[in-house]
Swiss-Prot record:
Name of the gene encoding the protein in the UniProt record: lysS
Pfam families with a match to the protein in the record: tRNA-synt_1f
Organism: Cenarchaeum symbiosum
Organism ancestry: Archaea, Nitrososphaerota, Candidatus Cenarchaeales, Candidatus Cenarchaeaceae, Candidatus Cenarchaeum
Main location: cytoplasm
GO cellular component: cytoplasm
The keyword Transmembrane helix is assigned to this record: no
Family affiliation: Belongs to the class-I aminoacyl-tRNA synthetase family.
Subcellular location: Cytoplasm
Motif extent ('HIGH' region): 39-47
Protein known as: Lysine--tRNA ligase
Length: 524
């Protein structure tokens, strides 16, 4: 089978995108990819992933010889439906108001919406993602969607019927797919848009009670007109994507399964109402918390880029996003160690050559490593040490941690000497050891012989001679008929939750014999 591009799903999508654009007869010199991002709640890894994956497809398009641009569009005209957990209760008075019109409770941005947007932009910057930042407030205020809004609202009756037909939503049969902002009370979801005045391009609305975020919000009773050429309101999501796609010449946008119906309708609006071919898409599954629930911007189960980057490198996040796009995945900060070590394995395989799984697998892993480094050429491997080993050593050495952990890594033969890269890894693993360490480990499968050997070793750890522990461990394994390699692997799994590590005898001495004996007994 022929390898497409660098052998990843990213390359496959990019090739499909370019082939489609060429078949449509559109100019492919510059290809815009878009990520539509919410600004009403705390941005999480799922929000980040939408933009990171779109950027990856853009990189692959660039790899094919085209120019690309990632448009990061933040919907800060969206209304606040509920106050996210952990945010000030003073935000309650702003429910149903556009997040761009709500003061930043922390006073560091021009609005609540920009505060939330800023957190996500901070994450993108940390990863090295380049983007063209656009705000809904400015987009509407500057009239960039004015023509699209006019055509959509002029065809609101047929659109309302189509929405009802496609997804069974009756709402837009009786009201326009446009949320006006009441000029009297400043709320938007309470202001029902009832008529489009095409000649003046204004929307008539009346502000009444509405259900917002699962509760009733009172309207003020005002009736007025909103100018669709400014920021006096916004299109509903059921039609807004299509307006953006045409106005910004968007050729690719991925989407989560939670907005699948909105994308289907927008595709139809784009094709049939705006006479503009909709972008190429791919659907991704959502990140779930460890309880299997969807990660939500308004709930407390949010893994943010900032939290992750306290413990892991940017490459660990990029690996998470680029290794695959299909299938729902449970995600928590406890996944940082495995992704850090997986990146180390990818790097080692990339520079050493070879690898398991045949040529196609090797090509895919090489491509994955390259995308994880944003296609920036790597002259050689970055300094690396097993993350779980670093965490264990960091738990042992809290005073003068960097110096003492580095010394042990040199003694174990893991590194040749100190370096800024290793110091950074020690700092990250130290944060994890201080904040996150849990005695909970993955299940270790042990056969009867290995259990017997481990039980004997736990008893002997207190009496084995100084400096002779490596030979004692080897002898115990042999006496129980357990291959030493397998016995060492079981010990690494118990101590490090990994399949390999430094020379086991000196490592146990460093951790403490009594402590390791307790760890072994806890698994028997």
């Amino acid at each position: 089978m022929e390898t497409i591009g660098r052998g990843t799903w990213i390359d496959k999508l990019a090739h499909e995108l370019v082939e489609r654009e060429e078949a449509l007869g559109r100019d492919t010199e510059m290809i815009n990819v878009e990520s539509g991002l919410g600004a009403s709640g705390i941005p999480h890894m799922g929000s980040l992933g939408d933009a990171v994956r779109a950027y990856g497809v853009g990189l692959a398009v660039g790899d094919m010889g085209h120019s690309f641009r990632l448009i990061a569009y933040f919907d800060d005209l969206d209304g606040l439906r509920k106050v996210p957990e952990g945010m000030p209760s003073s935000l309650e008075e702003h429910i149903a108001r556009p997040v761009s019109a709500i003061p930043d409770p922390y006073g560091c941005h021009d609005s609540y919406g920009m505060h939330m947007s800023g957190l996500l932009l901070e994450g993108l910057d940390a990863l090295g993602i380049e983007y063209d930042f656009r705000r809904a407030r400015d987009t509407y205020r500057d009239g960039l969607l004015a023509e699209q809004i006019h055509r959509i609202l002029s065809n609101s009756s047929v659109i309302g019927e189509k929405i009802a037909e496609m997804v069974g939503q009756e709402k837009f049969r009786s009201s326009l797919p446009y949320f006006a902002v009441c000029e009297q009370c400043g709320k938007m979801y309470t202001a029902e848009s009832v008529e489009y005045l095409a000649d003046s391009r204004k929307v008539r609305y009346r502000c009444g009670d509405a259900e917002v975020g699962g509760r009733k919000i009172a309207g003020c009773g005002h009736e007025g007109e909103a100018d669709t050429g400014g920021a006096g309101g916004k299109l509903a999501w059921k039609v807004e994507f299509a307006a953006r796609w045409q106005a910004f010449d968007v050729r690719f946008e991925a989407y989560g399964k939670d907005i699948m119906d909105s994308v289907r309708i927008n595709d139809w609006v784009s094709d049939e109402i705006l006479s503009s071919p909709h972008p190429h898409h791919t659907r991704y599954e959502m990140f779930l918390d460890k309880g299997g629930k969807k990660i939500s911007k308004s709930s407390g189960n949010v893994v943010t880029p900032q939290k992750w980057l306290r413990y892991g490198t940017p490459q660990s996040i990029l690996l998470l996003m680029y290794k695959r796009i299909t299938g729902a995945r449970e995600l928590g900060l406890e996944d940082v160690p495995s992704l850090m070590d997986e990146y180390g394995d990818l790097q080692r395989e990339y520079f050493a050559g070879g690898g398991r799984g045949g040529k196609a697998r090797e090509a895919k892993n090489r491509g994955l490593f390259e995308y994880t480094n944003l296609l920036e050429a790597q002259e050689g491997p970055r300094p690396h040490a097993g993350y779980r080993l670093l965490v264990e050593l960091s738990r042992l050495f809290r005073e003068n941690r960097t110096e003492r952990v580095t010394k042990k890594l040199v003694e174990y033969g893991v590194i040749d000497g100190p370096s800024p890269g290793i110091e950074r890894l020690i700092a990250l693993a130290g944060n994890y050891a201080d904040d996150m360490y849990s005695a909970e480990r993955t299940e270790v499968e042990l056969d009867g012989a290995t259990r017997g050997a481990l039980s004997e070793l736990a008893e002997m750890l207190g009496s084995a001679p100084e400096g002779g522990l490596q030979d004692v461990i080897y002898g115990v394994a042999k006496s129980h008929g357990v291959p030493p390699r397998d016995f060492f692997k079981a010990l690494y799994r118990i101590i490090l939750d990994a399949s390999s590590g430094p020379r086991i005898g000196p490592f146990i001495e460093d951790i403490g014999r009594e402590k390791v004996a307790g760890m072994i007994r806890g698994r028997l």
